[in-house]
């Protein structure tokens, strides 16, 4: 229930809702006694999130708003041409077919009879399906309370602590922006709303106006064979292809070509009082003809930053410096994709005293974005393609429970002492997660965009035991040659201006898993309605050192160095009384 009071509704999470429509049909069919088919079709319509008061905005290069005519080109709002209240249209053509097949071989003689075990001993299954997902509400959270409906302003220069709108060096005012009154969508005064108070726009997200609904294609094939009355073996292939996945990319990157041209011309940087253009100068104003300020009005001899994608010439008269769109402006796009393929082997046994499940997976996952904030390369999304951040190539897990039959071994002993003993555990051996490579501090690409600059790969990657001495390893924390997981000599900082580096951002794995959790339980039945449990548990019982991934940031002094580990052995004792 809405109270009408914003803070109260926010605390109670009132007023947040979503709309989603779907319809489906399934048909079951048995072709023969041992053949079974399931077909289905689902229709999905999921509306993107929107603000009920229309207080949203989007970024569309070169488009001028009619809702707020004085806003800079590139900034648009619901009601502008091609911009619905949901920013992206609700699409109604999302049809998701699916089919499943099952077959139980009936061979009883010959080689096939031995392979399949006879009638009713083996089941072969295959399936394919398309599944849509709704758009996560985090995408709307990124859009709300941005200009002109909220004010997030970053000073381009150092300011005084007590008066943060005054330049520390000169004492000159760059404009007091607070407090301010947010406009009301549809008000007549919006036609003359002054946007200079919001400029420059930094860390300003924009939801793609052509976004679609993410979906996945799922497919699998499995053979399940009964080995005995209590044991089943399963061999399976599992695959998933993700399409139109939500991700982010830089909306207004710096132009490397423009920066290098300014550098070749030895243009005067009016912001830093230097000559030439290089890393970190995407938001600076350059005078191409004289070593002089560009003035308050637009000057055709000046270049207003190298970020020209959203708005060219990217000039805003009220901004300081006079750049409309600065750093951290991103698109939320549905242009990511993924592929996952896995082979699986599972053995399961369920007996009176002993139960276990053992599974091994050999898999590979690739994508160009593993998460919402895993930025895609704005120039070419294929440059971001690599191992998924969750990729684990080899993964073996076994779980087991053994009810120890002391009562059968010591038949003359009291039942309360010999019954109720149980040991259980989970053992895992697995390769680690991929190491994320980057070169975060140098801005060699001249793009001013996080997550896209990479080091150069200059040799094969060699992984080593961080507990041992390794030539080629230098640990700045100890001054020794231990602690490396991979030797840094395989990489070098990229120094070629205007390029992204040659290393893939995720292409090899970090330290793996070697872990066993073990527990022992003794249940004592005191009376028909009373029982007492005593449980002893150990996590990582063998106390294996399981290192976490080192940093893959070549600008970090700990590049390739293991600095943390997962939990050591932890033991606990607990008791529980039942009545």
Predicted regions and their residues:
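Structural signature of Gram-negative outer-membrane beta-barrels, strongest in the C-terminal barrel
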Residues: 20-55, 69, 76-147, 395, ...
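Short, solvent-exposed micro-motifs at the edges of structured domains
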Residues: 2-19, 23, 30-38, 46-49, ...
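Surface-exposed extracellular loop regions of Gram-negative outer-membrane beta-barrel proteins
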Residues: 119-160, 243-249, 424-431
